[in-house]
């Protein structure tokens, strides 16, 4: 699978706007904001949701549909409001893409204003069904209207609301399939009985042809970002008689804990007794787990998810998010952004560690996965190239098996890599010009010195320009970069070896 967004059937979009198809998808618009000013009062995601693309100049954005440009954003600005003000007849703001797809799909016999979409991925035919380019809820949210999705639309299959019910659908799951039924069911998916094809009980989206490095939750979110289950919204399924029956049979399908007696931290920590295993029992208890008394097996009191065979370096919260991302306790404690980031990181790690031959489609997938990482986007804003970031991330994952956990460490390694590269280039140049060893050493030492005091080593990267020129003490006294005179919005401390 690649990170390319879905494109609707061309019959759903008039010929005169075919060139706009690429940016009908919100994430394709968001990708243009890689170098958008990080200090903007209005976030890149908000602007992309309102139909804007980044122009690359200041904070100026432009609508992909009407091409109206807006800049000089202020705190409290409404992206949709300003868009509507400058271009009240914009097709995007007025729901043209949503309404057009609904009209076409109705004509083709598909209910609820939804049409078939496919993702062409070279040799891959991983696909999705029943997803419009913009969901009705997203349109109402964007235009400021009240979101009112009737229970007859969501979820698509109330009988599969509970994870247990979805898990039972995998009785004939093929042996060749790469993902486990438990992981798929946890991501809201149930087996359709055809090949390795699964379907979301909520949005109705279908996925198949799974690859070894795929993660169910990541792919669900990537292909169906507006799914209410993915977004963690309340589905209000209790109004459905089928759902009530399902709730009685499967208590875990509600927001209530699977094991209420273990809802308190003290109760969970008590179960660990004389815990002798490598993972800290306090961390396990805080992450919602209690001990089962069988080796290092633990179970979450809320979702009922179990884990075992712990490694010393594993973090309980991360493992909880990796294997049971739909857990309500996890969502309440850590938030959806944390869960998403964990899946982005693990998806990249497993692709790089397990795959020996990188096909063009897999390379694109890895690139897109790296690009989604918030740390990567911040490093790009600081002036580092995507090529250098990708290279150093791949090296770290191949060596250690894990990705970077903090921006500070990533930036430090990038700076050190640049320094090593500069040393190599300097060494080659010195040999060509027959410069003495003493001269080479002097130059390298000067490169590390603060360009203001020429006494202490450089230790601060200026954002957004990315220049590395001063020590910590001298950096405190400047508001503009001494190299390019750009106003400094943030000063990132780094460590040089």
UniProtKB/Swiss-Prot annotation:
This is E3 ubiquitin-protein ligase XIAP. BIR repeats lie at residues 26-93, 163-230, 265-330. It catalyses: S-ubiquitinyl-[E2 ubiquitin-conjugating enzyme]-L-cysteine + [acceptor protein]-L-lysine = [E2 ubiquitin-conjugating enzyme]-L-cysteine + N(6)-ubiquitinyl-[acceptor protein]-L-lysine. Residues 329-350 are annotated as: Required for interaction with DIABLO. The first BIR domain is involved in interaction with TAB1/MAP3K7IP1 and is important for dimerization. The second BIR domain is sufficient to inhibit CASP3 and CASP7, while the third BIR is involved in CASP9 inhibition. The interactions with DIABLO/SMAC and HTRA2/PRSS25 are mediated by the second and third BIR domains. One of its GO terms (biological process) is negative regulation of tumor necrosis factor-mediated signaling pathway. A zinc finger (RING-type) spans 450-485. The lineage of its organism: Eukaryota, Metazoa, Chordata, Craniata, Vertebrata. SUPFAM superfamilies: Inhibitor of apoptosis (IAP) repeat. It comes from Homo sapiens. Changing residue 450 to A/S: Inhibits degradation of active caspase-3. Changing residue 188 to E: In XLP2; uncertain significance. Keywords: Apoptosis, Cytoplasm, Isopeptide bond, Metal-binding, Nucleus, Phosphoprotein, Protease inhibitor, Repeat, S-nitrosylation, Thiol protease inhibitor, Transferase, Ubl conjugation, Ubl conjugation pathway, Wnt signaling pathway, Zinc, Zinc-finger. There is a cross-link at residues 322, 328 (Glycyl lysine isopeptide (Lys-Gly) (interchain with G-Cter in ubiquitin)). It is linked to Lymphoproliferative syndrome, X-linked, 2: A rare immunodeficiency characterized by extreme susceptibility to infection with Epstein-Barr virus (EBV). Symptoms include severe or fatal mononucleosis, acquired hypogammaglobulinemia, pancytopenia and malignant lymphoma. The keyword Phosphoprotein applies. Multi-functional protein which regulates not only caspases and apoptosis, but also modulates inflammatory signaling and immunity, copper homeostasis, mitogenic kinase signaling, cell proliferation, as well as cell invasion and metastasis. Acts as a direct caspase inhibitor. Directly bind to the active site pocket of CASP3 and CASP7 and obstructs substrate entry. Inactivates CASP9 by keeping it in a monomeric, inactive state. Changing residue 80 to D: Loss of interaction with TAB1/MAP3K7IP1. Reduced activation of MAP3K7/TAK1. Strongly reduced activation of NF-kappa-B. It holds the Pfam family BIR. The keyword RNA-binding does not apply. Changing residue 86 to E: Loss of dimerization. Reduces activation of NF-kappa-B.
């Amino acid at each position: 699978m690649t990170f390319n967004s879905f494109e609707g059937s061309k019959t759903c979009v008039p010929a005169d706007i075919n060139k706009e198809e690429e940016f009908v998808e919100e994430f394709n618009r968001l990708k243009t904001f890689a170098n958008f000013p990080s200090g903007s009062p209005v976030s890149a995601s908000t602007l992309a949701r309102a139909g804007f693309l980044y122009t690359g100049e200041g904070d100026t954005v432009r609508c992909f549909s009407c091409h109206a440009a807006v800049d000089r954003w202020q705190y409290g600005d409404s992206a949709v409001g300003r868009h509507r003000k400058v271009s009240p007849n914009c097709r995007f703001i007025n729901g043209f893409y949503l309404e057009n797809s609904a009209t076409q799909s109705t004509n083709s016999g598909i209910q609820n204003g939804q049409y078939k979409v496919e993702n062409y991925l070279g040799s891959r035919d991983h696909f999705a069904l029943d997803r419009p380019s913009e969901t009705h809820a997203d349109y109402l949210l964007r235009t400021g209207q009240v979101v009112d999705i009737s229970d007859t639309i969501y979820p698509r299959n109330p009988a599969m609301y509970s994870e247990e019910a979805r898990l039972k659908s995998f009785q004939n799951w093929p042996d060749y399939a790469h993902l486990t039924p438990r992981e798929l069911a946890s991501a809201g998916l149930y087996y359709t009985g055809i090949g390795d094809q699964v379907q979301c009980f909520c949005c109705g989206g279908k996925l198949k042809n799974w690859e070894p490095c795929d993660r169910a939750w990541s792919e669900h979110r990537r292909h169906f970002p507006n799914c209410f289950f993915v977004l963690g919204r309340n589905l209000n399924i209790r109004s459905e008689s089928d759902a009530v029956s399902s709730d009685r049979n499967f208590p875990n399908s509600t927001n209530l804990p699977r094991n209420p007696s273990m809802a308190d931290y003290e109760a969970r920590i008590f179960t660990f007794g004389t815990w002798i295993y490598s993972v800290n029992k306090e961390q396990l208890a805080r992450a919602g787990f209690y001990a089962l008394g069988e080796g290092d097996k633990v179970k979450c009191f809320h979702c009922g998810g179990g884990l075992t065979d712990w490694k010393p370096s594993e973090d309980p919260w991360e493992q909880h998010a990796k294997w049971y991302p739909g857990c309500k306790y996890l969502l309440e404690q850590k938030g959806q952004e944390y869960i998403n980031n964990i899946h982005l990181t693990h998806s990249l790690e497993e692709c790089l560690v397990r795959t020996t031959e990188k096909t063009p489609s897999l390379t694109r997938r890895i690139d897109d996965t790296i690009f989604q990482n918030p740390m990567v986007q911040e490093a790009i804003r600081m002036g580092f190239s995507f090529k250098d970031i990708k290279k150093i991330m791949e090296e770290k994952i191949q060596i250690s098996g894990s990705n970077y956990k903090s921006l500070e460490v990533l930036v430090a390694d990038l700076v050190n890599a640049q320094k090593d590269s500069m040393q190599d280039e300097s060494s080659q140049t010195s040999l060509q010009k027959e410069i003495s060893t003493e001269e080479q050493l002097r130059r390298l030492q000067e490169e590390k010195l603060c360009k203001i005091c020429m006494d202490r080593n450089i230790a601060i990267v200026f954002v957004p320009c990315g220049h590395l020129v001063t020590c910590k003490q001298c950096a405190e006294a400047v508001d503009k970069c001494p190299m390019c005179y750009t106003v400094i919005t943030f000063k990132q401390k780094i460590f040089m070896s």
